[in-house]
């Protein structure tokens, strides 16, 4: 129904390439005249949109110097910006909106507040780029061309990931990242909080997770020759670490909620767990005292499948659930080598006890236990596609698969009735190089992912029929931070590729056009400049 409506909007609309709005709206009709924003303009809201009205006034205030009043009625104002819930717009869904600009009024209406918020984000892009500045800009006429836009997203999951384990990122940057997601109408922030190289979230029941697990001696910064020869690895000899307190997490979650973004935490299990094992050696399989890992790649140390380790995972998730209202809780599940389980008396006893036939089946059993535990608390487990390797038996029906090793995992999960988020390395891994001229590129993990390849991505595999395709929730961009050591490095790798993926996730496939996108992008980067985003310059 959503796709049919989008097509009807496209047929009925007038194609417009003069507005540099990203993602490209479904339907745009240009009018005549302009709306002039003045100090006397009133932001008019109803009760459901009041906070969005305050946000809009706060966002416009620094650059314009105007303190726009927010009111439930226009009074005698000659020019108004009206934000309203409209029950007749149910056909636009939870996040769609209608924006109308005339000479005297800007009206944003939607079925739900999220739609009003996205209409506001579009309005901000209709203003001059200087509207994003945080200080008064003299001499600017704050005008918006007359237009009517009717818009709605193609996918419900429009995400961006951030790995803060390999390289810890300050809380203020995390909030800036969330602002940039909101600007591009992305609604899922996947926060990768734990891994071999660092545990980044305070868990009160297990204080050593951050006292020990959040810190490492140094970091791998390069390889002189072949990666397989560890004698050629180069370290920086600089201690690295950090973590977010539970108050920090609450602050970030509230900040995202105000921007209609769901924060999806990732707590890795059973692999990528060396930081946890370094803090509590009884979680491992060897009993050895480990250090937090300082190099990259797949590590052999994984959590053991004992009752005590399972209770640990549940204890951690109990505190995580109290911090994150997200329906989805990511438990990783990727890159969990089974060599230690093959020689572990505990793991082998568990396999015999359950009548399993392999270590992969043991991981699937463990994932099923966690998915059912989460389902019993009203949440859905989401994991990387390796969670399918031992079969889907026992996996809670509401469990979601994130397909990163190509699209086959997503296809298999969707065909089995599970929701999926499509995240293949080929189109969504922003830690890959942006050019094949590596001498001009900062160090990256490898690969090659140019902007055009991101934009060309189609998240719904042709192998799925119309019923199975409904299980594709959407797509998401990933940034792993092995070599992205600071916020500016992250921004360089993510932007503008995330801008392209935002359009993939929002705009109907038949409305996409790379030449048109790049034309709008060349004007859109003026906004990124104002926002001090260290994006890769366009060719």
Name each region found by the language model.
Residues 1-7:
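Sec-dependent signal peptide recognition
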Residues 14-157, 478, 489, 497, ...:
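Contiguous, structured surface segment used for ligand recognition
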Residues 90-314, 318-328, 369, 373, ...:
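Feature activates predominantly on carbohydrate-active enzymes
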Residues 276-282, 286, 290-399, 404-416:
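Active-site neighborhood of glycoside hydrolase catalytic domains
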Residues 380-388, 393-399, 403-539:
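Flexible, acidic glycine-rich loops studded with aromatic residues
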């Amino acid at each position: 129904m959503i796709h049919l409506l989008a097509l009807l909007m496209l047929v009925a609309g007038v194609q417009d390439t003069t507005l540099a709005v990203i993602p490209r709206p479904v339907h745009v009709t240009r009018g005549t005249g302009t709306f002039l924003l003045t100090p006397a303009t009133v932001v008019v809201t109803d009760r459901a949109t009041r906070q969005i009205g305050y946000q809009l006034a706060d966002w416009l205030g620094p650059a314009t110097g105007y303190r726009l009043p927010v009111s439930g009625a226009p009074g005698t104002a000659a020019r108004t910006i009206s934000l309203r819930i409209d029950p007749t717009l149910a056909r636009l869904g939870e996040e769609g909106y209608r924006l109308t600009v005339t000479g005297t009024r800007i009206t944003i209406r939607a079925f739900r507040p999220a739609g009003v918020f996205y209409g506001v984000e579009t309005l901000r892009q209709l203003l001059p780029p200087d509207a994003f500045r945080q200080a008064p800009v003299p001499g600017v006429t704050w005008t918006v061309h007359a237009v009517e836009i009717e818009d709605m997203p193609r996918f419900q999951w429009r995400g961006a990931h951030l790995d803060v384990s390999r390289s810890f990122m300050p809380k203020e940057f995390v909030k800036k990242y969330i602002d940039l997601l909101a600007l591009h109408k992305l609604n899922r922030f996947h926060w990768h909080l734990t891994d071999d190289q660092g545990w980044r979230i305070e868990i009160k029941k297990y204080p050593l997770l951050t006292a020990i697990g959040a810190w490492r001696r140094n970091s791998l910064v390069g390889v002189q020759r072949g990666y397989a020869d560890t004698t050629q690895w180069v370290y920086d000899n600089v201690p690295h670490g950090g973590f977010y307190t539970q108050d920090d997490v609450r602050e970030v979650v509230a900040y995202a909620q105000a921007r209609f973004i769901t924060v999806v935490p990732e707590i890795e299990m059973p692999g990528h767990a060396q930081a946890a094992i370094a803090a509590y050696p009884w979680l491992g399989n060897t009993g050895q005292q480990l250090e937090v890992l300082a190099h990259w790649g797949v590590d052999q140390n994984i959590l053991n499948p004992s009752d005590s380790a399972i209770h640990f995972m549940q204890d951690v998730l109990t505190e995580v659930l109290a911090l994150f209202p997200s329906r989805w809780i990511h438990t990783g599940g990727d890159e969990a080598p089974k060599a230690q389980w093959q020689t572990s008396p505990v793991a082998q006893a568990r396999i015999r006890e359950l009548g399993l036939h392999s270590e992969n089946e043991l991981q699937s059993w463990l994932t099923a236990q966690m998915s059912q535990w989460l389902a019993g608390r009203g949440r859905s487990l989401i994991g990387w596609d390796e969670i399918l390797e031992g079969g889907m038996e026992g996996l809670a029906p509401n469990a979601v698969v994130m397909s990163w090793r190509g699209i086959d995992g997503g296809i298999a999960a969707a065909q089995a009735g599970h929701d999926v988020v499509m995240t293949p390395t080929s189109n969504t891994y922003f830690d890959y190089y942006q050019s094949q001229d590596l001498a001009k590129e900062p160090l990256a993990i490898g690969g090659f992912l140019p902007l055009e390849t991101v934009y060309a991505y189609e998240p719904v595999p042709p192998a799925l029929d119309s019923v199975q395709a409904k299980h594709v929730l959407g797509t998401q961009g990933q940034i792993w931070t092995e070599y992205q050591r600071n916020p500016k490095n992250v921004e360089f790798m993510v932007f503008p590729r995330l801008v392209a993926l935002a359009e993939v996730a929002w705009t109907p496939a038949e409305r996409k056009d790379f030449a048109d996108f790049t034309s709008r992008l060349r004007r859109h980067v003026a906004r990124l400049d104002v926002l001090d985003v260290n994006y890769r310059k366009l060719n």
